[in-house]
């Protein structure tokens, strides 16, 4: 079985434990990092990847019964359309207006349900005792990207989210097979219009290009592993894959059962045969390894990547393929590897907006204050949950940062720390008290905290890399202005300075 070179066990220190908790989750308080460190490398990795052992508490309780109703956005029935047609033929303006009012109210209700779902998911990421489960759910949402803007059905988006969560660290094959039966994806890529004799190529194209085999230039390949005829034949294999009444439906009458030639193999292939062929191609495991690498190890702005990175990705792909696409085993191998903890891979990932707001709550221990404000902040920063900009998902990396988003990131952190709006945004003032002193409680000596120690410790705790001396002194200056006292007010002010640093945007 292929292996990545493991990290020496004695090299798993506080900084390594923090790196693991941030990358495989959304970070945490000093106590959480110390708890992970106390488990040792193997125990820490096992705890993260074997998350089923932790109870799913928090906002997950009764979510289906209390928050979402599949009837909010039911598809209009044939009877509804027939009634509408008759009303139009008869010129019954009252019936037509009633039909439209019902439709508009249904759409408003569904948009409200979608907002509730976004709030729920953000809350779950903040509160979850299973950080890797939610990190992977977010990862698969970006990989198999579908947007509510097109789907226009909150229940379908919710069910897709639950599907990603169910298989988060399971088997990639189950994810790929399941996505061709997912109503949200079928609607998003128009496969509900993919019929015998009139194939729609959208799903077939994206399942090859974005979901399984990838584009050739990503890993420096000389040629694509598939060609246009493969896409066309794959589309035929997916004919009849649609949905009815909020569930997948295989319309046998609209399925093309003729002979098809895909990736050099001929047969009367259906959609799942098509998926099996993709999973069997060597490019698939490498491409998924590449996506995992970019999400969990290093953003890698250069394309194609360096020889070193490519070698690690190829090896990780072999681990994935050797484990028959078992994600838990593959991630465990990655999180134990020396490469994952290498200095070149620390502070090598720009926090996404969701990672920023969720991670700040978990790292700093600030109150949530207003979950919809956090949702709105992430959206303004470029990442609204369930609204990726395209089927490619979010570009990530350096695309997250520009002059305006950097300013908004800084102001978001100030609001989270103080409840006050520093940037002129219509965010609600929040007076929920925040006591930052637990962050430095282990530095306390005879009831006081040394400001020099606090300055160094905060950087060690919250930053993934050292900062210039001038920036460190800017943090220290806050305590100087407070007569060298480290208390709730001065510590909060110091955190406002620290979270405004460019280095805070990295993990």
Predicted feature descriptions by range:
Residues 2-13, 18-30, 51, 71, ...:
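Flexible, low-complexity segments enriched for small/polar residues
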Residues 2-3, 85-91, 95-103, 114-121, ...:
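Active-site substrate-binding loop specific to GH73 endo-beta-N-acetylglucosaminidase modules
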Residues 10, 111, 129, 224, ...:
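Aromatic-acidic/polar surface patches that form glycan- and anion
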Residues 15-23, 109-111, 199-202, 206, ...:
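Short, compositionally biased low-complexity segments
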Residues 28-143, 147-167:
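N-terminal accessory alpha/beta regions
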Residues 36-37, 48-49, 88, 126, ...:
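Hydrophobic residues in alpha-helical segments
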């Amino acid at each position: 079985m292929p292996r990545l070179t493991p990290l020496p066990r004695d090299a798993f220190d506080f900084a390594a434990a923090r790196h693991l908790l941030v990358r495989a989750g959304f970070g945490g308080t000093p106590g959480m990092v110390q708890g992970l460190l106390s488990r040792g490398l193997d125990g820490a990795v096992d705890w993260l990847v074997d998350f089923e052992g932790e109870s799913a508490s928090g906002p997950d309780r009764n979510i289906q019964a209390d928050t979402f109703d599949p009837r909010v956005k039911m598809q209009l029935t044939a009877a509804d359309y027939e009634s509408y047609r008759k009303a139009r033929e008869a010129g019954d303006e009252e019936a037509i207006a009633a039909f439209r009012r019902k439709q508009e109210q249904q759409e408003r209700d569904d948009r409200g349900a979608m907002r509730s779902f976004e709030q729920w998911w953000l809350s779950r990421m903040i509160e979850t005792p299973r950080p890797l489960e939610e990190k992977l759910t977010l990862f698969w949402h970006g990989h198999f990207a579908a947007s509510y803007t097109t789907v226009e059905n909150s229940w379908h988006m919710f069910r897709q989210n639950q599907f990603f969560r169910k298989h988060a660290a399971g088997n990639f094959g189950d994810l790929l097979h399941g996505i061709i039966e997912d109503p949200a994806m079928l609607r998003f890529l128009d496969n509900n219009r993919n019929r015998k004799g009139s194939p729609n190529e959208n799903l077939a194209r994206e399942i090859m290009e974005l979901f399984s085999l990838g584009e050739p230039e990503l890993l420096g390949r000389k040629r694509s592993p598939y060609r246009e005829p493969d896409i066309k034949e794959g589309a035929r294999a997916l004919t009849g894959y649609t949905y009815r009444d909020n569930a997948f439906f295989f319309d046998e009458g609209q399925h093309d059962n003729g002979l098809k030639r895909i990736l050099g193999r001929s047969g009367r292939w259906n959609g799942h045969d098509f998926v099996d062929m993709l999973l069997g191609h060597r490019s698939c495991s490498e491409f998924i390894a590449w996506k995992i690498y970019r999400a969990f190890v290093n953003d890698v702005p250069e394309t194609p990547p360096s020889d070193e990175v490519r070698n690690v990705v190829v090896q990780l792909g072999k681990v994935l393929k050797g484990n028959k696409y078992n994600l838990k085993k593959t991630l465990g191998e990655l999180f134990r590897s020396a490469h994952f903890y290498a200095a070149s891979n620390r502070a090598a990932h720009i926090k996404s907006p969701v990672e920023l707001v969720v991670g700040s709550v978990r790292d700093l221990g600030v109150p949530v204050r207003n979950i919809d404000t956090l949702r709105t902040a992430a959206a303004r920063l470029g990442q609204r949950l369930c609204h990726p900009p395209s089927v490619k998902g979010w570009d990530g990396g350096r695309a997250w940062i520009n002059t305006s988003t950097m300013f908004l990131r800084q102001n978001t952190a100030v609001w989270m720390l103080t409840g006050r709006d520093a940037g002129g945004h219509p965010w609600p003032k929040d007076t929920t008290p925040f006591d930052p002193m637990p962050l430095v409680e282990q530095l306390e000596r005879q009831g006081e905290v040394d400001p020099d120690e606090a300055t160094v410790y905060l950087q060690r705790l919250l930053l993934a890399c050292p900062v210039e001396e001038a920036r460190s002194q800017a943090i220290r200056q806050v305590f100087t202005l407070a007569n060298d006292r480290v208390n709730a007010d001065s510590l909060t002010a110091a955190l406002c300075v620290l979270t405004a640093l460019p280095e805070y945007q990295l993990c």
